Every structure is written in structure tokens, then in C-alpha cells.
């Protein structure tokens, strides 16, 4: 595990401990479970939204609402989650990915609530999930999907987090960085398999990461390529390899209008 990832996970454990002191788990769980059928807050179907786009011959784009990153610093000074989400929705995005990590990505729970509330798209809580508390928390914030990072979790905990999310009606995107993590990911029930093209140790990005893993992917998995999609040539390279789901952040966040850039990139 990389030093930066270890540092992030230590902070996450502290965050969960602090959150539990403010609100106990039974109370949080009860609220999360009550939202299964709540108008406007019930899960919107993250996987379904991706598959519908792909079935229509389009790319399934998970468009990121991200202010900053540890490696690149602030990506977007004028950061208005509602406006970004509306722009994505009107320019063909399938889903949103909203950073909720405060300390490393300058994200916030409110960004998720505001972005999802401004458009009809399902939203991923993009964060480092290490505890069941965060899964219930994600649902109360409106998340339709959570991210599970194989490099950050032991298999038992990962399965427990997935089961909790599925029970609440959410989808799960499991993320791998290399073939050494694939076996653990494939033991989960979720069909959503993300491949992060960014090396968590060096922060270098290579689209070969996705392409190298493709031969090892079962046919029933929906592969999402993450990081490093910066131009139309990158999109073409992936789609030529039969990868049609993308998680893109930086390219959109640096553009004057994120949604317009999405439409241009995936034209």
C-alpha cells in the first residue's frame, strides 16, 4: 500500500470515529433504510443509467464533480456543484461522481447533496470507504452508488461494505489498479468493475492499465476506465477496445464549461 493511501486511510478512520460521536450508527442506519422509497431520494439506478447509454450506442460517462486532487491541486477555482451537475446532465452524462473527501480532495457531503439535487442523474459518492458507517452516511446524503477500492480494503470488509450498500438499494463500483487485485474484485457481486489508470504509488497515468486487464475480465462485468481520459484519441482507443464506460474528472473540471467539454470529448 502506498504512503499516500495509508495516510488517507488513517484520516478516514479518524473521521468515522468523530462522526460516530456526533450521531450513533442505529440512528444513521434507520434514516438510510427509510429512504428506499422516499420521493427524490430513493436510489436512481447507477448501473442501469450506464447500461442504457451504452445500449443506445453512446459512451456511459460518469462525470466527476471535483474541486481538487492531491497530485494536481485545485482544478477549478469557480466551483459550483449545481451548475456543474446541470451542465453534465444536459450534455449527455450518464451519472455523476462527487468527491466527498474534505482533507485531500477539498470535497464535501454538501457537494453531493447539491449536485444530485440539481439534476436527475444518479450519483457516486467518491471517497475512501473503510467502515459501514460511511455506507449508511452515503445513502443519507443521496448517493446511488459507492466506490470500493481493493487496495484499501481486506476482502472480508469489502464484502461486508458491498452487502450493506446493495441492501440499501445502492450500486457498487469496485476499483482495481492491477491484475494482483482482480481476484478480490471478482469475488464481489457487483458487475461494475473500475480500472484506475493512475498508479497509486507513483501517480503516473497509463491507459495501458485498462487495456492490459481486459483479457482477464469476465464477459458479465461492465468495465469502467478511470483517470487519464484527456482527449478524443483516448476515448477512441478505449471504445475500439470495447470499453464504453468512462469516469472522467480533470479534463472536464479544467474546461470553461464541463458539460460542453464532455460533449466535445465524446462526440
From Swiss-Prot:
What is catalysed by this protein? Answer: 1-(2-carboxyphenylamino)-1-deoxy-D-ribulose 5-phosphate + H(+) = (1S,2R)-1-C-(indol-3-yl)glycerol 3-phosphate + CO2 + H2O
Give GO terms: molecular function aspect only.
indole-3-glycerol-phosphate synthase activity; phosphoribosylanthranilate isomerase activity
Q: Which key words are in the record?
A: Amino-acid biosynthesis, Aromatic amino acid biosynthesis, Decarboxylase, Lyase, Tryptophan biosynthesis
Q: Which organism is it from?
A: Cupriavidus necator (strain ATCC 17699 / DSM 428 / KCTC 22496 / NCIMB 10442 / H16 / Stanier 337) (Ralstonia eutropha)
Task: Extract the Pfam families matched here.
Answer: IGPS
Please give the pathway this protein is involved in: Amino-acid biosynthesis; L-tryptophan biosynthesis; L-tryptophan from chorismate: step 4/5
Q: Which PANTHER family match?
A: INDOLE-3-GLYCEROL-PHOSPHATE SYNTHASE (PTHR22854:SF2), TRYPTOPHAN BIOSYNTHESIS PROTEIN (PTHR22854)
Membrane-spanning ranges = none
Q: Which gene encodes it?
A: trpC
Q: What protein does this entry describe?
A: Indole-3-glycerol phosphate synthase
Q: Which residues form a coiled coil?
A: none
Amino acid at each position: 500500500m502506498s504512503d499516500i493511501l495509508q495516510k488517507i486511510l488513517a484520516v478516514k478512520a479518524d473521521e468515522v470515529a468523530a462522526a460516530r460521536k456526533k450521531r450513533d450508527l442505529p440512528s444513521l442506519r434507520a434514516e438510510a433504510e427509510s429512504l428506499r422509497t422516499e420521493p427524490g431520494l430513493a436510489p436512481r439506478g447507477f448501473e442501469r443509467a450506464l447500461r442504457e447509454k451504452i445500449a443506445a450506442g453512446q459512451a456511459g460517462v460518469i462525470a466527476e464533480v471535483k474541486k481538487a486532487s492531491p497530485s494536481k491541486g485545485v482544478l477549478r477555482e469557480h466551483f459550483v456543484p449545481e451548475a456543474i451537475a446541470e451542465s453534465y446532465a444536459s450534455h449527455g452524462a450518464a451519472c455523476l461522481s462527487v468527491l466527498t473527501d474534505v482533507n485531500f480532495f477539498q470535497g464535501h457531503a454538501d457537494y453531493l447533496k447539491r449536485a444530485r439535487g440539481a439534476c436527475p442523474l444518479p450519483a457516486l459518492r467518491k471517497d475512501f470507504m473503510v467502515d459501514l458507517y460511511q455506507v449508511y452516511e452515503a445513502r443519507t446524503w443521496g448517493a446511488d452508488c459507492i466506490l470500493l477500492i481493493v487496495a484499501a480494503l481486506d476482502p472480508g470488509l469489502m464484502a461486508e461494505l458491498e452487502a450493506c450498500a446493495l441492501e440499501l438499494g445502492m450500486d457498487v463500483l469496485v476499483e482495481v489498479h492491477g491484475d494482483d487485485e482482480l481476484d478480490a474484485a471478482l469475488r464481489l457481486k457487483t458487475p461494475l468493475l473500475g480500472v484506475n489508470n493512475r498508479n497509486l504509488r507513483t501517480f503516473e497515468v497509463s491507459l495501458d492499465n485498462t487495456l492490459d486487464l481486459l483479457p482477464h475480465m469476465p464477459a458479465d462485468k461492465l468495465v469502467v476506465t478511470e483517470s487519464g481520459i484527456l482527449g478524443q484519441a483516448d476515448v477512441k482507443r478505449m471504445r475500439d477496445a470495447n470499453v464504453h464506460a468512462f469516469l472522467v474528472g480533470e479534463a472536464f473540471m479544467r474546461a470553461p464549461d464541463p458539460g460542453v467539454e464532455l460533449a466535445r470529448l465524446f462526440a
